[in-house]
Amino acid sequence: MKNVDLVIDLQFGSTGKGLIAGYLAEKNGYDTVINANMPNAGHTYINAEGRKWMHKVLPNGIVSPNLKRVMLGAGSVFSINRLMEEIEMSKDLLHDKVAILIHPMATVLDEEAHKKAEVGIATSIGSTGQGSMAAMVEKLQRDPTNNTIVARDVAQYDGRIAQYVCTVEEWDMALMASERILAEGAQGFSLSLNQEFYPYCTSRDCTPARFLADMGIPLPMLNKVIGTARCHPIRVGGTSGGHYPDQEELTWEQLGQVPELTTVTKKVRRVFSFSFIQMQKAMWTCQPDEVFLNFCNYLSPMGWQDIVHQIEVAAQSRYCDAEVKYLGFGPTFNDVELREDVM
């Protein structure tokens, strides 16, 4: 059954994945929402009434009116404290009829130890330094005496997550029982470990194939990929690496905009001109069906319409049939427009 819609970032992150995930969840009424987040990324959604969610653990799709399951994949790295905070903040949505399932092989973050292990790279490569990489490395070491790294083991002595951690069989059965699934990717394609910006990158690939694997979703279940992009791509502040040869680094003053801050570290973001080359590479690897172009409010109608055209030309040049379907003009549900309504 092809019933999984996957949201994925086509640039360097911070393109509005949280916004479009919340928007689609409210519009389409998915019964299951799933992700494999790490603490190095935050996802924000503001609904039509102005209520705000900033998640580092839970999917933003929990706002779906038909919600039955919230699932955290094996590729997740999460803080138990943060998970509890997010559940408490949305307890009106996560009622008794909603099941929260944590994959037994999800990684549990030791906030103090794992963050401390990343102090050096936080400055040398512009990492957020939240401990994601250190936690993953500890899991990869596969120490049979370590009972503090995967959710299955931690649940044996930490009752806060014991009720949520399932077996692999229960995980698979939950996916099979789902009617419509919204899967939420994190970070951005160009931050992928195996793309060209290594070592100024994240600790995994940010592609559809990787996220489906991290969520335990079989490939035949994929219905469509919704790619997200912004008119002016950003990178985190500091020594966060280079950019594509057809783009230049800009200033927020040049754009006439208040400087944006990163969701997690609150650093001023670096901002760039749009890259056709970046979009070609993302289209080839990610093969989105639909695109959400965000931050159109930073440009005139002629400006963002030109970028819409560039995105679709880039797609066609890489054997991809993607169309720009959604446009973002601000941070809330009310600021998302269907392209057909404004062009």
From Swiss-Prot:
Protein's recorded name: N6-succino-2-amino-2'-deoxyadenylate synthase
EC number, UniProt record: 6.3.4.25
InterPro entries: Adenylosuccinate_synth_dom1, Adenylosuccinate_synthetase, P-loop_NTPase, Phage_PurZ
Record's function text: Involved in the synthesis of the atypical nucleotide dZTP (2-amino-2'-deoxyadenosine-5'-triphosphate). Catalyzes the condensation of aspartate with deoxyguanylate into dSMP (N6-succino-2-amino-2'-deoxyadenylate), which undergoes defumarylation and phosphorylation respectively by host PurB and guanylate/nucleoside diphosphate kinases to give dZTP. dZTP is integrated into the viral genome instead of adenine by the viral DNA polymerase. This Z-base probably completely replaces adenosine and forms a triple bond to the opposite T-base. The resulting non-standard viral DNA is called Z-genome.
Binding residue positions for L-aspartate: T263, V264, R269
One GO MF term: magnesium ion binding
Keyword Magnesium: yes
Swiss-Prot/TrEMBL keywords: ATP-binding, Ligase, Magnesium, Metal-binding, Nucleotide-binding, Purine biosynthesis
UniProt GO BP: 'de novo' AMP biosynthetic process; IMP metabolic process; purine nucleotide biosynthetic process
Native organism: Vibrio phage phiVC8
Top enzyme class: ligase
UniProt pathway: Purine metabolism
NCBIfam families: amino_Aden_PurZ (NF038379)
Record Pfam families: Adenylsucc_synt
Binding site for ATP: S14, T15, G16, K17, G18, G42, H43, T44, Q187, N294, N297, G330
Annotated Mg(2+) binding sites: S14, G42, T263
Catalytic activity: dGMP + L-aspartate + ATP = (2S)-2-amino-2'-deoxyadenylo-succinate + ADP + phosphate + 2 H(+)
Cofactor: Mg(2+)
